């Protein structure tokens, strides 16, 4: 059957390209795990298993895949089966598909890709956290002015400031680690919907593919969107925290505040104004984070009011879009780490703001309460009036 050229170009060819780029290795792993299970359960005779094994080994070494989907096949799955048929014959190649479907295969591949994304993000976050903690230890007594509602509020240490973001990230990493466990359930064996009459061993396939367990309900296995929506919600939270912190750093590096600055290798100048030093790395963090967040947030809308079935919203084109957003997110982390580690505190400016704004007087009011036994609210009014008169 010849497919529409428009549909073939816009949908099927892009699906094929995505499989070739991102999912070929997981696809090969699923084939091997499924064959091992078919052999161990004696669903396939030894002679057929041997023939398929030889074909898969040959397919593993295959190079020079067509850059575009061949017209005679619908997708990468059928291209792979057609190629395997050329190696070992149609009967043996077709036997590899006993007790499975593209439904359970595809969502298994997507989960394998997603768990790699999650694992890579967690590893990178741990590196970032270690760098921020080490940096904070070097600034345990470095003073910084902290703001509330855009106004100077209290003085603290730079380590305290960074530590707040470290704590936020640790919470998100913990939640994403839990999400990983949800993603790491194996759909294989669900087949199209209702499993199969063959005596398969779902746990064996799950184990071979590195999953913690099979997904018990086969309809959930091929219908759920949790493998995608749960992790991206945690990434949205993470990126939201990053952009808020970056915006706060941008405020502190403004000319009017001036307690943070960046070295020359992280600023850009104006094409006409010679005095300008723009810390644009902070803006690019916001841009990349915003682009990734936009994609992640779109997935909730994508699944809104869709049928709870095996549907293409739960498919590879969605995953392809996700992969691009993950790249933006990982680059956001690289830029954020660079901005954190290279930011410089201007202690004289911190002291100037502290003196002019009276941000140490909260402790003064508390000390009056402790030492003079004055009522707290009275002490508060005394100090407030003192600051007000001193600022005239």
Predicted regions span which residues?
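Conserved hydrophobic residue
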Residues: 43-44, 258, 374
């Amino acid at each position: 059957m010849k497919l529409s050229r428009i549909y073939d170009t816009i949908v099927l060819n892009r699906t094929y390209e995505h499989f070739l780029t991102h999912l070929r290795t997981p696809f090969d792993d699923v084939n091997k795990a499924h064959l091992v299970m078919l052999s161990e359960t004696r669903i396939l005779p030894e002679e057929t298993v041997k023939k398929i094994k030889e074909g898969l080994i040959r397919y593993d070494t295959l190079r020079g895949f067509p850059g575009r989907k061949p017209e005679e096949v619908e997708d990468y799955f059928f291209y792979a089966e057609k190629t395997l048929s050329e190696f070992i014959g149609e009967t043996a190649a077709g036997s590899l598909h006993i007790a499975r479907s593209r439904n359970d295969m595809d969502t298994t591949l997507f989960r394998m890709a997603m768990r790699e994304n999650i694992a890579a993000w967690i590893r990178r976050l741990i590196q970032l956290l270690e760098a921020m903690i080490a940096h904070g230890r070097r600034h345990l007594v470095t003073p910084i002015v902290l703001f509330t509602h855009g106004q100077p509020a209290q003085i603290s240490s730079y380590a305290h400031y960074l530590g707040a973001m470290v704590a936020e990230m640790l919470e998100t990493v913990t939640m994403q680690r839990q999400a990983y466990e949800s993603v790491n359930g194996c759909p294989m064996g669900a087949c199209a919907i209702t499993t199969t009459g063959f005596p398969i061993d779902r746990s064996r396939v799950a184990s071979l593919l590195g999953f913690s367990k099979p997904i018990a309900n086969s309809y959930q296995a091929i219908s759920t969107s949790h493998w995608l929506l749960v992790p991206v919600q945690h990434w949205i939270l993470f990126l939201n925290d990053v952009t808020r912190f970056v915006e706060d750093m941008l405020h502190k590096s403004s000319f009017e505040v001036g307690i943070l600055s960046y070295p020359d290798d992280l600023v850009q100048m104006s094409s006409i104004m010679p005095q300008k030093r723009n810390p644009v790395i902070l803006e690019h963090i916001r841009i990349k984070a915003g682009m990734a967040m936009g994609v992640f947030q779109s997935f909730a809308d994508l699944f809104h009011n869709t049928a709870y079935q095996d549907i293409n919203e739960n498919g590879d084109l969605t995953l392809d879009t996700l992969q691009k957003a993950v790249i933006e997110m990982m680059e956001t982390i690289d830029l954020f780490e660079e901005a954190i580690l290279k930011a410089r505190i201007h202690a004289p400016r911190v002291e100037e703001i502290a003196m002019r704004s009276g941000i140490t007087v909260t402790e003064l009011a508390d000390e009056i309460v402790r030492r003079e036994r004055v009522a707290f609210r009275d002490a508060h009014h005394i100090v407030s009036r003192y600051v007000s008169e001193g600022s005239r």
